């Protein structure tokens, strides 16, 4: 039966008995933290709450970095930023987190690491990971609005790999369309063509969304003629797909954006 360490720690914290709470928290981590990852995460978060009450921002940041190493994600990255900003060390921490995602080097083992030990056992590198963690690097580049880095890591993706966990190619194209409109158009076209290749009416409807996005960008770049030529090439390549022809009829020969009066 799972021991109720989280409830005990919460009661002790509510009573202001923080030393006892920390003692039982660490006991719980030693006892069941690895067997029950969810409980372990809850106990570590309770320690983070204690350090926040103490306004011990360097340790709060160190704990948050450990969360990020265990489960890299954009939200965890932002939590690292919040705590590290309070500690006045975000630029160094940011570089170390990105280096971890790229090289697999644990942040606290890197030269010049600015944060203290958290007081808990630090996680090891997950051996299932294959660095660089391209999806996470793309996600953070989108978060930081760095389209050049989005493209850098998008181009680093494994061949034939079209999905990045929760990050879709539509989000990638949207993130880079102002910086590199031709790349955004190419991504949307590729998405549409892969959907068309499924030879399913539902996929055609999905494809048209990406075709419209590509067409809008081409129109703003005064490439309406090229857009029409592209649609005509699709018609010739897929002339037997009647439902697709109907959809393309709704696109071809019509400006994607209304002309200004």
Regions flagged by a language model, labelled:
Residues 1-261:
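Eukaryote-biased, non-catalytic alpha-solenoid scaffold regions
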């Amino acid at each position: 039966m799972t021991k109720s360490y989280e409830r005990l720690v919460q009661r002790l914290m509510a009573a202001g008995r923080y030393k006892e709470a920390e003692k039982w928290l660490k006991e719980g981590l030693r006892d069941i933290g690895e067997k029950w990852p969810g409980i372990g995460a809850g106990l570590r978060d309770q320690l983070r709450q204690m350090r926040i009450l103490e306004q011990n921002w360097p340790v709060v940041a160190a704990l948050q970095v450990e969360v990020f190493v265990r489960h890299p994600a954009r939200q965890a990255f932002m939590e690292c930023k919040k705590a590290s900003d309070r500690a006045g060390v975000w630029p160094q921490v940011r570089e170390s987190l990105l280096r971890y995602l790229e090289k697999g080097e644990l942040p606290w083992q890197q030269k010049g690491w600015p944060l203290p030990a958290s007081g808990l056992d630090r996680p090891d590198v997950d051996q299932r990971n294959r660095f660089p963690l391209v999806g996470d690097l793309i996600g953070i580049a989108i978060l930081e609005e760095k389209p050049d880095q989005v493209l850098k890591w998008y181009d680093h993706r494994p061949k034939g790999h079209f999905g990045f966990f929760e990050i879709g190619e539509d989000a990638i194209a949207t993130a880079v369309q102002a910086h590199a409109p031709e790349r955004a158009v190419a991504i949307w076209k590729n998405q549409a063509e892969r959907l068309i290749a499924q030879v399913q009416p539902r996929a055609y409807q999905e494809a048209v969304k990406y075709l419209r996005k590509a067409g809008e960008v081409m129109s703003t770049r005064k490439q309406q003629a090229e857009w029409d030529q592209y649609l005509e090439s699709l018609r010739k390549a897929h002339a037997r797909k009647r439902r697709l022809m109907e959809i393309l009829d709704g696109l071809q020969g019509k400006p994607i954006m209304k002309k200004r009066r």
